[in-house]
């Protein structure tokens, strides 16, 4: 039997999961996406010098840039067929073989044009201060249709008459909402049908029973890597609701969103920045000013190049929040942590760690459940000395500055999860390994 590892973001997304998934695929034969859609963005930097290439992926699992690794899109993913085919074409144009190594579950709900129209119209209608910060890509409305049992799924594409009947029914409902409630234009039935059917034959060879394929791979002794998107604090159930995404981003979804049994998941790796970031609206207790020069927040934003891969919006930045990570660790059952972007903190004289909050006159050591309570939290900080030496590209634990090691050990103590990996740069080999998830 192989060993299977789940990689999860523990904050509000953008933790650096793509690089770690790519690095781990050196020991995996398969990589699986199990939730989200093309609202997720992973940036991979592969190669050295003039041969270096940057890949920006949204739907295709990060393992695709590793030769011979099979990639799977599980039933928990919502699929924009046009975007997927465009992404595949982009990869193939630079010599990455995709189609022979990619499987798509027939159960993936399809993102169609009316989902995008609904997403954008709803966000535009929200008053300032209540905007979610959606990417406007139709993710939320597609998940709504899935739960309401009216979604069109990938396998529906291969039955044109049935697809047209279902489309007419669901479009009648959504056009009523668009025109009567949101005061925007209706979506044309024929245009939607033609757009969907255009992609059917291109997708057909890629569609397989992913659940069965993963079971067979596991039985054959393959190591499998489950690639989470977004982060735990954006989870629709466990995040800062309603400022969340529309899917479950936690480790438990790896099973539900791919069709493998929970007992087949052996190790959960939580990816965590050495500080915190957030894109879009919602409470952020340890948030700092990122606009004022020569401040810690500005350094995090500028040195960390904190711009959203998908949205191109500036990410909000703040001190590491151990109380938030403590909740993430429990929800996900984390086996180990991977700390990323440690070098962004190089040169700061002091570092602060949020260890808990004051809420209604009481001290709490765990991120509250509701966004309203989180917004009222006053962070409690512990101060630690910084370091002046560089940590960028360091490959051995003992070569890190003493204060950097002390900072990492303190994070470990506060969160109750061992730091197994430290990422010190975007390259594959800029990684310190204390314990390998695959036992290598």
Curated annotation (Swiss-Prot):
It is found in: Plastid, Chloroplast. Signal peptide: none annotated. InterPro entries: Adenylosuccin_syn_GTP-bd (IPR018220), Adenylosuccin_syn_Lys_AS (IPR033128), Adenylosuccinate_synth_dom1 (IPR042109), Adenylosuccinate_synth_dom2 (IPR042110), Adenylosuccinate_synth_dom3 (IPR042111), Adenylosuccinate_synthetase (IPR001114), P-loop_NTPase (IPR027417). GTP binds at residues 13-19, 41-43, 315, 341-343. Its cofactor is Mg(2+). Mg(2+) binds at residues 14, 41. GO terms for biological process: 'de novo' AMP biosynthetic process; IMP metabolic process. This protein may be expected to contain an N-terminal transit peptide but none has been predicted. NCBIfam families: PRK01117.1, purA. This is Adenylosuccinate synthetase 1, chloroplastic.
């Amino acid at each position: 039997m192989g060993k299977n590892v789940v990689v999860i973001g523990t904050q509000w997304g953008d933790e650096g999961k793509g690089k770690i998934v790519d690095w781990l695929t050196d020991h995996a034969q398969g990589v699986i996406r199990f939730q989200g859609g093309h609202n997720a963005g992973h940036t991979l930097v592969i190669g050295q010098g003039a041969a270096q290439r940057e890949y920006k992926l949204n739907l295709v699992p990060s393992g695709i840039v590793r030769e011979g690794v099979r990639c799977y899109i599980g039933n928990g993913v919502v699929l924009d067929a046009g975007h997927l085919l465009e992404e595949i074409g982009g990869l193939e144009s630079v010599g990455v073989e995709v189609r022979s190594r990619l499987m798509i579950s027939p159960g993936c709900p399809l993102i169609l044009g009316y989902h995008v129209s609904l997403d954008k119209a709803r966000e535009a209608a929200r008053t300032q201060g209540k905007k979610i910060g959606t990417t406007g890509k139709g993710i939320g409305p597609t998940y709504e249709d899935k739960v309401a049992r009216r979604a069109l799924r990938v396998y529906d594409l291969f039955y044109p008459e049935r697809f047209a009947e279902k489309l007419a029914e669901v479009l009648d409902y959504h056009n009523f909402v668009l025109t009567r409630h949101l005061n925007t234009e209706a979506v044309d039935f024929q245009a939607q049908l033609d757009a969907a059917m255009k992609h059917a034959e291109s997708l057909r060879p890629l569609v397989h029973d992913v659940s069965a394929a993963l079971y067979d791979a596991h039985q054959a002794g393959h190591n499998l890597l489950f690639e989470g998107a977004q982060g735990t604090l954006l989870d629709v159930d466990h995040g800062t609701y309603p400022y969340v995404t529309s899917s479950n981003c936690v480790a438990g979804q790896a099973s539900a969103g791919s069709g493998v049994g929970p007992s087949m998941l052996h190790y959960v790796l939580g990816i965590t920045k050495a500080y915190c970031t957030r894109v879009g609206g919602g409470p952020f207790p340890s948030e700092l000013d990122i606009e004022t020069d020569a401040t810690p927040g500005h350094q995090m934003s500028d040195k960390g190049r904190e711009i959203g891969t998908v949205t191109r919006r500036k990410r909000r930045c703040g001190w590491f929040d151990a109380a938030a990570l403590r909740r993430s660790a429990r929800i996900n059952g984390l086996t180990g942590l991977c700390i990323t972007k440690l070098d962004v903190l190089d040169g700061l004289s002091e570092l602060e760690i949020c260890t808990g909050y004051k809420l209604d006159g009481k001290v709490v050591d765990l991120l509250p459940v509701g966004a309203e309570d989180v917004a009222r939290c006053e962070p409690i900080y512990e101060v630690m000395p910084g370091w002046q030496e560089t940590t960028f590209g360091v490959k051995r634990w003992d070569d890190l500055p003493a204060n950097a090691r002390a900072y990492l050990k303190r994070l470990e103590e506060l969160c109750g999860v061992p730091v197994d990996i430290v990422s010190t740069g975007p390259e594959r080999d800029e990684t310190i390994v204390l314990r390998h998830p695959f036992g290598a």
